[in-house]
Regions:
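Catalytic machinery of carbohydrate-active enzymes
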Residues: 1-329
């Protein structure tokens, strides 16, 4: 049995990509045991992934003493391989402190992290213009595995989690939206307009807003049509929530990549970032779709524009528009 340590503390979208690569490695190398160093805020996602055997939690705010305590735990195991998926000084130092025969990192590592590797993984043929997933897949040949995704990432069930209330009275799966983004330039402000258009389209589906940060929606549609779970969406519940959806619509953010990893139809809304590099992977998959704002400016993208695209992707079925009572009037 070979032991692999993956170092990828953040962020959510990058971690999802890494979990997909780990899953592919497990499929191709069933005897491989995979451990992972991850930031505390993302640890529940990594712990829940069936491909990961052990999780080491990095608490950034614990300072140098906390870093050394973490690495003391890591050094209790002698690994065969260490993969630094992040390629920054901090993760380079983690690679240096870990015990392993082979320490591999990205050839485009920054902050002198490359000094701590004894093997540098080449970039794909398109170099830095490659999709983030394709860059991570180049680590697979280090283990004599093919640089391709095999198998679908799986998550352990969450005990006691019941999401049946998300379905409409007809039993239709909901449209799940994630209206928030950590970066303001990636945050589209047309989700209310899009929500109201879908709520009136006659499909009978609920629209669910989700995310860890609360997003206010004044005069929202009634609860029979709309549910706001923003601020009440735990990371560990995210895979189950997304798998219940018939569509996931969101900004360029972690949930978009998780939905793509789980095979759920996705519509990503992109502004300044390039979907060819950061979109749902792969963009050629029949369930993965994006809308790019004109000139990369999300202020120029209307809810009407996105709804027209969604309607076309959703099958263009003719439905009877249904009004819903407005609140606050």
């Amino acid at each position: 049995m070979s032991q692999l340590l993956i170092i990828k503390p953040s962020s959510l979208g990058d971690i999802v990509h890494g979990l997909q690569v780990a899953t592919s490695l497990k499929v191709q190398k069933p005897d491989l045991r995979i451990s992972w160093i991850v930031r505390d805020i993302f640890a529940p996602m990594v712990r829940a992934c069936e491909a990961i055997d052990r999780t080491y939690v990095f608490r950034r705010h614990d300072g140098p003493a906390g870093f050394m305590r973490l690495m003391d735990q890591v050094r209790e195991t002698e690994f065969d391989y260490v993969f630094d998926f992040q390629g920054l000084l901090r993760t380079g130092l983690m690679t240096w402190r870990a015990k392993a025969k082979l320490k591999a990192g990205r050839s485009d590592a920054r902050e002198c992290a490359g000094l701590f590797y004894n093997r540098k993984v080449p970039l794909p043929p398109d170099g830095r213009r490659s999709h983030a997933m394709d860059i991570l897949l180049q680590f697979c040949p280090v283990l004599d595995a093919k640089p391709e995704l095999q198998g679908m990432v799986q998550f352990r069930p969450v005990e006691g989690l019941n999401l049946n209330y998300l379905e409409s009275r007809s039993g239709a799966s909901p449209v799940v939206m994630f209206p928030d983004s950590r970066r303001s330039e990636k945050k589209w402000h047309g989700f209310k307009e899009l929500t109201e258009a879908i709520a009136r389209d006659g499909s009978g589906r609920k629209i669910v807003w989700a995310g860890n940060a609360y997003v206010d929606y004044k005069d929202a549609p009634p609860e029979s049509v709309f549910l706001n779970l923003t601020g009440n969406t735990s990371l560990v519940s995210l895979p189950t929530l997304i798998k219940r959806a018939c569509w996931v619509i969101c900004n360029d953010s972690g949930p978009l990549h998780l939905a793509a990893a789980l095979g759920v139809p996705t519509l990503g809304i992109f502004g300044p970032t390039d979907p060819r590099l950061f979109g749902p992977y792969p963009l050629t998959a029949p369930n993965n779709h994006v809308v790019q704002a004109p000139l990369g400016n999300l202020k120029l993208l209307t809810g009407k524009d996105v709804y027209a695209r969604f309607q076309k992707l959703d099958g263009g079925r003719s439905r009877t528009a249904v009004p819903f009572p407005q609140r606050g009037f």
